[in-house]
């Protein structure tokens, strides 16, 4: 049974390694249950399942609740295709065919638990943090366009958790929001909070869309201590025609 994050969450750069691992793992451990998840395999799950008969199934889309229910399924000792088919958000095999068990309700970001209470486990590591999920843009070359609705974590929760990082003098916090500044009010409020509570040590990394930065945001960013804020700007193409595609 394999639900490790290293094998479970698939991105494009990992595919060649995952392909080899899936095939070889099944040879070594024929009884192992192999599940994959992540954007690359969720996009065309039925095709992936047909291409790799070694797979037990694929977790589609957001994995928090699906992963939990799948783990509970195995822990309970329940077996059989019928039991798996009751878990939403899966691509599985049933009666020799690949089926989808139905869509999973999108996760409310404000109910996801904070995982960094014990920082000893993350000593000398970059901490990843999510204050929003989804992207409002429709770039045809980007899988983020699949999740068209942007959801925000409650700002009171975000501020409390960021204050914890500041109090603990964490070296770096990397926001994994797809386009952090797609919601100006949300972004500005977080930046203003970080500016007011700067501890002189912690720096914050954001992925942004530079073309929607306005003068107000730039003025605010210019007030930060040098090195406090890192901006990752994706230059996908210098061709306006391609960017409009």
Task: Label each region the model flagged.
Residues 5-102:
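Glycine-rich beta-alpha loop elements in corrinoid/cobalamin-binding modules
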Residues 1-11, 242-245:
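Single conserved hydrophobic/aromatic residue that forms the stacking wall/gate
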Residues 1, 15-16, 42, 181-185, ...:
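Loop/helix-junction capping segments adjacent to catalytic residues or to phosphate/diphosphate-binding pockets
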Residues 103-109:
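A short, sequence-level motif marking secondary-structure junctions
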Residues 110-244:
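Radical SAM [4Fe-4S] cluster-binding motif and immediate context
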């Amino acid at each position: 049974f394999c639900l490790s994050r290293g094998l479970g969450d698939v991105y494009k750069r990992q595919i060649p390694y995952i392909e080899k691992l899936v095939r070889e793992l099944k040879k070594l451990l024929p009884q192992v249950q192999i599940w994959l998840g992540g954007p690359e395999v969720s996009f065309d799950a039925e095709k992936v399942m047909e291409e790799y008969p070694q797979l037990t199934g694929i977790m589609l889309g957001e994995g928090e609740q699906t992963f939990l229910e799948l783990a509970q399924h195995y822990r309970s000792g329940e077996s059989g295709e019928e039991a798996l088919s009751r878990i939403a958000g899966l691509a599985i095999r049933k009666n020799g065919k690949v089926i989808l068990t139905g869509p999973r309700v999108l996760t409310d970001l404000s109910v996801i638990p904070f995982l960094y209470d014990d920082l000893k486990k993350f000593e000398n590591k970059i901490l990843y943090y999510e204050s929003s999920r989804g992207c409002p843009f429709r770039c045809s070359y980007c899988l983020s366009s699949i999740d068209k609705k942007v959801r925000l974590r409650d700002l009171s929760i975000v501020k409390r958790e960021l204050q914890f990082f500041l109090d603990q003098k964490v070296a770096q916090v990397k926001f994994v929001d797809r386009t952090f500044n797609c919601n100006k009010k949300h972004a500005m409020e977080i930046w203003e909070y970080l500016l007011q509570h700067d501890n002189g040590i912690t720096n914050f990394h954001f992925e942004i869309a530079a073309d929607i930065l306005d003068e107000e945001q730039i003025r605010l960013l210019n007030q930060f201590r040098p090195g406090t804020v890192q901006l990752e700007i994706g230059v996908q193409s210098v061709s306006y025609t391609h960017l409009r595609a």
